[in-house]
């Protein structure tokens, strides 16, 4: 039972790490897009 709990915990942590990386990358991508839009907006009146 303890081994199963350990495996389950490592699986959950692995999933959390994967999702945090995915979310971080998407946030960085969105921020970069916003920066590009703001830059273009400032460039073109």
Swiss-Prot record:
Give the highest taxon in the source lineage.
Eukaryota
The entry assigns this protein to a family as follows: Belongs to the UPF0377 family.
The protein depicted here goes by the name Putative UPF0377 protein YIL175W
